[in-house]
UniProtKB/Swiss-Prot annotation:
This is UPF0229 protein VV1_2091. Disulfide bonds: none annotated. InterPro entries: UPF0229. Residues 81-111 are annotated as: Disordered. Belongs to the UPF0229 family. It comes from Vibrio vulnificus (strain CMCP6). It comes from the Bacteria. Pfam families: DUF444. HAMAP family: UPF0229. The lineage of its organism: Bacteria, Pseudomonadati, Pseudomonadota, Gammaproteobacteria, Vibrionales. Residues 93-102 have a biased composition (Gly residues).
Length: 423
């Protein structure tokens, strides 16, 4: 019996290479579709992938055809309506079922749907946060040299002889030999029983006995021909070099929860911070996050309370800045940590407090921060806090401020604030 062993490395995902090539080729169109999807789905929904639509015109293959100019004569079969010299009216515009046209429906004309396919959760998040990074991330003074440490990472089918795993290789060998010879051994046992029965019969059946002995000999030879060890059985210990963290970073999230922040404004702020939190967890393994909520008083809270607490009150923004400064001094030495902050507010603040905020940022926070981002969520004209912060933007390169007017602005503003710097 013939034995077929599938040793293809691609396994169940035999079109993975074609899929990767397609995604590389149409990366820009896919990224545009993912950016549009951010506004359609909940930002916290990262358990599933996303349906991506690419306009049919963008995936057309190039082709050679005759140009529009020149004179040509053609014979169209079945014509009983036109004669030489007649001008044929162009078909009226119509769209396919999934087209994006704005014209009216028509009984004439043809169109084609957009090409739609699904990307996985990991592909969605990779595309969402591609080209983003924490600005000005520097190595701290304590860990100036990147150290590497080897970690065991399972087994692989190729490697150095010194890394061979004898036990795992013999297990693979035993499994292969069992699979390839189990059927033959079962048949051999049956033939040996049959031979014993024939040998004990009277009169002796020499011809049948010789035939069975020949079959038994061939089976034993086939069983013995199964190699004890094969290159397919070899397993090598796999080691991966992982960098010891050389850059420690902390992100402070400061959110205004005062009474002037209505529910829609708070929802936009929370969505921005959820996006920031996902970005940090997806891109960096060793970034700590400190959550601060404030109204007239500021308080450090955990992740759950930051996003779901209903506490509210008046507005004194400087309380959050003071608390951040206290936490930095107590837990995050400037020489050892890269310090970042993202502040969200509707811009409504006690008038006398806005200059105080500017003073705190100028003298205490911005000199110690790698990057400080301020987003103001409002459709109204800006107030004193925005105008004070504008002076900071002129003086400090590590300070950025943006205005968010609606949910649709969240992702574009986020990308502007954290776009990866190019060398």
């Amino acid at each position: 019996m013939a034995q077929f062993i599938d040793r293809r490395l691609n396994g169940k995902n035999k079109s993975a290479v074609n899929r990767q090539r397609f995604m590389r080729r149409y990366k820009e169109q896919i990224k545009e579709s993912v950016a549009d999807a951010v506004n359609r789905r909940s930002i916290t929904n990262t358990e599933t992938g996303e349906d991506v639509a690419i306009p049919h015109k963008d995936i057309k293959e190039p082709l050679f055809h005759q140009g529009k100019g020149g004179l040509r004569e053609r014979v169209h079969p079945g014509n009983d309506q036109f004669i030489t010299g007649d001008k044929i009216e162009r078909p009226k515009g119509g769209q396919g079922g999934g087209g994006a046209g704005d014209g009216d429906a028509s009984a004439d004309g043809e169109g084609q749907d957009d090409f739609v396919f699904q990307i996985s959760k990991d592909e969605y998040l990779d595309l969402l946060f591609e080209d983003l990074a924490l600005p000005n991330l520097k190595k701290n003074q304590v860990n100036k040299i990147t150290e590497w440490k080897k970690h065991r990472a399972g087994y692989q089918t190729a490697g150095m002889p010194s890394n061979i795993s004898i036990v795992r290789s013999l297990q693979q060998s035993l499994a292969r030999r069992t699979a390839m010879s189990a059927g033959k051994k079962r048949l051999l046992h049956e033939l040996e029983l049959e031979l014993e029965r024939i040998q004990n019969q009277e009169p002796a059946q020499k011809l049948e006995e010789m035939k069975l002995k020949q079959e038994i000999a061939e089976l034993r030879k086939a069983i013995e021909s199964v190699p004890f060890i094969d290159t397919f059985d070899l397993r090598f210990k796999n080691y991966e070099r992982k960098p010891v963290p050389s850059s420690q970073a902390v992100m402070f999230c400061l959110m205004d929860v005062s009474g002037s922040m209505d529910q829609a404004t708070k929802d936009i702020a929370k969505r921005f911070y959820v996006l920031l939190y996902l970005f940090l967890n997806r891109t960096y393994e060793n970034v700590e996050v400190v959550f601060i909520r404030h109204h007239t008083q500021a308080k450090e809270v955990d992740e759950h309370e930051f996003f779901y607490s209903q506490e509210t009150g008046g507005t004194i923004v400087s309380s959050a800045l003071k608390l951040m400064d206290e936490i930095v001094k107590a837990r995050y030495p400037v020489g050892e940590w890269n310090i970042y902050a993202a502040q969200a507010s509707d811009g409504d603040n006690w008038a006398d407090d806005s200059p105080r905020c500017k003073e705190l940022l100028t003298s205490k926070l911005l000199p110690n921060c790698q990057y400080y981002a301020y987003i103001e969520i409002t459709r109204r004209s800006h107030q004193t806090l925005w105008h004070e912060y504008e002076k900071l933007e002129e003086s400090f390169d590590n300070f950025a401020m943006k205005n968010i007017r609606s949910v649709e602005d969240i992702f574009p503003v986020f990308r502007e604030l954290f776009h990866k710097e190019t060398a």
